[in-house]
Regions:
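Glycine-rich, N-terminal phosphate-binding loop of Rossmann-like dinucleotide-binding domains
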Residues: 58-59, 82, 211-213, 240-241, ...
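Rossmann-like adenosine-cofactor binding region
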Residues: 63-66, 183-277
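Phosphate-binding beta-alpha-beta segment of Rossmann-like dinucleotide-binding domains, i.e.
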Residues: 103-153, 168
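Rossmann-like dinucleotide-binding domain for NAD(H)/NADP(H)
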Residues: 100-101, 234-331
C-alpha cells in the first residue's frame, strides 16, 4: 500500500478536493491530509511527509527540497494538482529523478472551452450588440455584420494540452482548423485534427486566432506589430494563454485602428494598470484571468489527480507525467 501525503493547505483542500476524492485515494493507500493553513512550520511539513511514497501538491505547496526528500527516501512520485510544476520542484528533486505529473490537461479543458466561447460570441457580435441594445439601439441590419461559426478558418497557436483540446472542440463545427507549433510535425498536427502552417500563414488566412502558447523565452512577444498587421480585417484574436506572448502596446495600436476584435483573458502584468487602454476599447473583451479551471471546475483537477494516482499504483504510464529533461520549454 502506498503512503500518500496530501500536502495541500486547508484553503486549497476546500476548493479542489472533497471527501469523494479522498475516499478514492484511500482505496490506493494510507492517506494523510495536511492539517494547517500555511507551510510556515518547516518541521511540521517535514514530519507530515516523512515516509511518504507519494506526495500530492497544488498551488502554494512548498518546494520539494532536500529536507523533504530526505524525510521520504522511498518517494516514488509527486502528483501536482495544478499547472506548472516549476514552483514545487528543486534542483535536488531533478537530480533524484523523482517522477512528477501535473494537472495541465484538466485545467486546459476549461481554458479551451472559454476560448471557444469567446470565439463564437465574438463572431456573432454578442458583446457589441448587447452594448447597443442596452443603450437603446436596435440594429435592424445586424444580420449583415455578424459571422456564423461555419466555414471559417480558425487558427490555434500551440499544440499543447490546451491547443489539442481546442481542436477537439472545434471538430464539432464545420470550420477549417489550422495550427502553428514549431515543435510538432505536420503528421503529428494532422493526427490532432488540424493542418500545420507557419505563424505568418495562420495569421494571414484565419478569421479567428486562438493563442495557447506557453510563457517561455521563445514565445515572449511572439505576436507583435510586424505580424499582427497580417491579420484579416474583422478577424478575432483570443488570448487565454499568457500576456507575455503578445506585445501589448502593439496589440493596442492595432486594435485602435478598429480592424480587429480581441478577447483577452491574460495581460502582462496582471492586473493591467487602471489607465490601460484595453480596459476602454470597444473592440476588446477583457476578463480577469478566468479561462482556466475555476470555482466548481477545480474538481476536474481532483479527478485528474486521482486518475493519475490510480495509474501510478497500477503500474501504468501517467497521462501527464512531465519529462524533467524538457523543463526549459515548458511553462
Amino acid at each position: 500500500m502506498e503512503k500518500i501525503a496530501l500536502l495541500v493547505d486547508k484553503v486549497h483542500q476546500g476548493k479542489i478536493f472533497s471527501e469523494k476524492y479522498y475516499e478514492r485515494m484511500r482505496k490506493l493507500g494510507e492517506l494523510k491530509i495536511y492539517d494547517a493553513d500555511s507551510y510556515d512550520d518547516k518541521d511540521y511539513v517535514r514530519n507530515f511527509v516523512a515516509g511518504s511514497t507519494v506526495i500530492v501538491t497544488t498551488w502554494g505547496s512548498p518546494v520539494i527540497d532536500k529536507d523533504i526528500l530526505d524525510a521520504c527516501p522511498d518517494l516514488k512520485a509527486v502528483i501536482h494538482a495544478a499547472g506548472s510544476i516549476k514552483p514545487v520542484i528543486s534542483d535536488e528533486f531533478i537530480a533524484r529523478r523523482i517522477r512528477i505529473t501535473n494537472s495541465a490537461v484538466a485545467i486546459g479543458e476549461g481554458v479551451a472551452e472559454t476560448a471557444l466561447g469567446f470565439a463564437i460570441s465574438a463572431c456573432k457580435g454578442f458583446y457589441q450588440l448587447n452594448r447597443d441594445t442596452s443603450s437603446g439601439i436596435w440594429r435592424e441590419n445586424a444580420f449583415d455584420t455578424v459571422i456564423d461559426f461555419y466555414d471559417i478558418n480558425v487558427g490555434v497557436i500551440s499544440g499543447g494540452y490546451v491547443g489539442r483540446h481546442m481542436v477537439k472542440l472545434l471538430k464539432n463545427f464545420h470550420v477549417n482548423i489550422y495550427m502553428y507549433d514549431p515543435i510538432l510535425t505536420a503528421e503529428q498536427i494532422s493526427a490532432i485534427g488540424a493542418e500545420k502552417v507557419s505563424l505568418e500563414e495562420l495569421l494571414t488566412k484565419c478569421d479567428v486566432v486562438s493563442v495557447h502558447a506557453p510563457s517561455i523565452p521563445e514565445t515572449d512577444n511572439m505576436l507583435h506589430k510586424g505580424n499582427l498587421c497580417l491579420m484579416k480585417d474583422k478577424a478575432v484574436l483570443i488570448n487565454t494563454a499568457r500576456g507575455s506572448v503578445i506585445n501589448e502596446q502593439d496589440l493596442i495600436d492595432e486594435l485602435k485602428t478598429g480592424r480587429l476584435f480581441a478577447c483577452i483573458d491574460v495581460t502582462n502584468p496582471e492586473p493591467p494598470v487602471e489607465d490601460n487602454e484595453l480596459r476602454r476599447l470597444d473592440n476588446v473583451i477583457l476578463t480577469p484571468h478566468i479561462a482556466g479551471t475555476v470555482s466548481n471546475g477545480l474538481k476536474r483537477i481532483a479527478l485528474h489527480a486521482c486518475e493519475e494516482l490510480e495509474r501510478l499504483v497500477g503500474g501504468e504510464k501517467m497521462r501527464t507525467e512531465v519529462n524533467l529533461d524538457e523543463l526549459a520549454r515548458l511553462a
